[in-house]
């Protein structure tokens, strides 16, 4: 798996190694072809706000945006990078805003590192065609997101690696409804 990280945010506390690790773990668990590529870019509030209005027609900053190279259907095989005959090698781009994520982490009672890991897994799922526009999609995507994130922490422990303690608070592994409540506290998120 080739994952490039670019930090254009100017924000302290962004752990490049951790974000590449969680992204690689999530994509590996989803059987994505090991030759697949993606990029994670950390940007500032102005940049994410500009992208948000340009691509989503929504004003203000947000936490994460994903730009898949190809439109994929979750679980489908034709043309996917995890198909027997590998599809496109470039999955796309995940754009994170650490400054916005810090606001969410503070409101949720956990670290910036955990919030960025959660947002990275969320972005990976979007790159693979998952979405949360319906209640059924929300349930599937947030369930898978939380499972992957929790399993990643277990994998880290098994490897003897620790980027930050696994949070145990009620907002650490939110379902869609819990995340919607957090978005009311920190307007603009909306993962």
From Swiss-Prot:
GO terms for cellular component: cytoplasm. Its cofactor is Zn(2+). Residues 176-191 have a biased composition (Basic and acidic residues). The keyword Transmembrane does not apply. Residues 164-191 are annotated as: Disordered. Its main location: cytoplasm. The keyword Zinc applies. Binds 1 zinc ion. Pfam families: YbeY. InterPro entries: MetalPrtase_cat_dom_sf_prd, YbeY, YbeY_CS. One of its GO terms (biological process) is rRNA processing. It is found in: Cytoplasm. Its EC number is 3.1.-.-. Zn(2+) binds at residues 122, 126, 132. One of its GO terms (molecular function) is RNA endonuclease activity. Keywords: Cytoplasm, Endonuclease, Hydrolase, Metal-binding, Nuclease, Ribosome biogenesis, rRNA processing, Zinc. Single strand-specific metallo-endoribonuclease involved in late-stage 70S ribosome quality control and in maturation of the 3' terminus of the 16S rRNA. Belongs to the endoribonuclease YbeY family. HAMAP family: Endoribonucl_YbeY (MF_00009). NCBIfam families: rRNA maturation RNase YbeY (TIGR00043). This is Endoribonuclease YbeY. The gene is ybeY.
């Amino acid at each position: 798996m080739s994952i490039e990280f670019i930090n254009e945010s100017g924000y302290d506390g962004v752990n490049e190694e951790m974000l590449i690790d969680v992204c690689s773990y999530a994509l590996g668990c989803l059987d994505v072809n090991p030759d697949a590529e993606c990029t994670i870019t950390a940007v500032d509030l102005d940049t994410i706000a500009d992208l948000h209005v340009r691509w989503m027609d929504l004003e203000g900053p947000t936490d994460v945006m994903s730009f898949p190279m190809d439109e994929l259907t979750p679980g489908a095989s034709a043309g996917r990078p995890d198909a027997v005959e590998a599809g496109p090698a470039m999955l796309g781009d995940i754009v994170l805003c650490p400054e916005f994520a810090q606001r969410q982490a503070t409101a949720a009672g956990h670290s910036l590192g955990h919030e960025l890991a959660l947002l990275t897994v969320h972005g990976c799922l979007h790159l693979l065609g998952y979405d949360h526009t319906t209640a059924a999609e929300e349930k599937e995507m947030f369930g898978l997101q939380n499972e992957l994130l929790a399993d990643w922490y277990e994998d880290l422990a098994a490897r003897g690696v620790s980027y930050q303690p696994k949070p145990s608070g009620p907002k650490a592994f939110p379902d869609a409804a819990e995340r919607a409540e957090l978005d009311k506290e920190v307007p603009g998120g909306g993962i």
